[in-house]
């Protein structure tokens, strides 16, 4: 079983860069606030397409696709809480629990990310088989 994670690696790297920029320049959040709905829509489309591109470039079984969607979502959504932990450690020399930063909103974002990624994988898989 060979899984090609090149599309996801590019997406994860860009997401990491965006989070680093956010930590360096937090005021940019307020400048982008009016476009939040458009950015959420674009983010959802990107996650769907990354999932589709990942499965098209590698043939995997159904359980592997679900596990891949879970791990990819967990890795992506964990970037911001880990950054918050590092920022607190740098500023205050104090480390809080990971669960302290992983609020209910992160669980909802995680669920949406996983479902979109998995949906992209499934549609990509079935379109290769000629079922879509």
Language-model segments: residues:
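Membrane-interface helix-boundary motifs at transmembrane edges
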Residues: 2, 53-64
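Alpha-helical membrane-associated segments of multi-pass integral membrane proteins
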Residues: 4, 11-15, 19-22, 93-132
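Small-residue packing motifs within transmembrane alpha-helices
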Residues: 5, 11, 40, 47, ...
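Interfacial non-cytosolic loop connecting adjacent transmembrane helices
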Residues: 26-34, 80-108
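Canonical alpha-helical transmembrane segments
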Residues: 38-58
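Hydrophobic alpha-helical membrane segments
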Residues: 43, 65-91, 109-113
């Amino acid at each position: 079983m060979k899984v090609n994670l090149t599309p996801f690696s590019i997406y994860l790297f860009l997401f990491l860069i965006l989070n680093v920029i956010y930590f360096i320049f937090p005021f940019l959040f307020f400048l982008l606030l009016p476009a939040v709905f458009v950015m959420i829509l674009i983010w959802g489309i990107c996650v769907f397409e990354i999932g589709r591109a990942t499965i098209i470039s590698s043939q995997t079984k159904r359980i592997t696709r679900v596990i891949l969607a879970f791990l990819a979502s967990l890795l992506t959504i964990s970037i911001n809480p880990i950054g918050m932990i590092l920022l607190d450690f740098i500023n205050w020399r104090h480390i809080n629990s990971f669960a302290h930063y992983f609020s209910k909103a992160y669980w909802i974002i995680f669920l949406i990310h996983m479902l979109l990624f998995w949906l992209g994988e499934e549609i990509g898989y079935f379109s290769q088989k000629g079922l879509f």
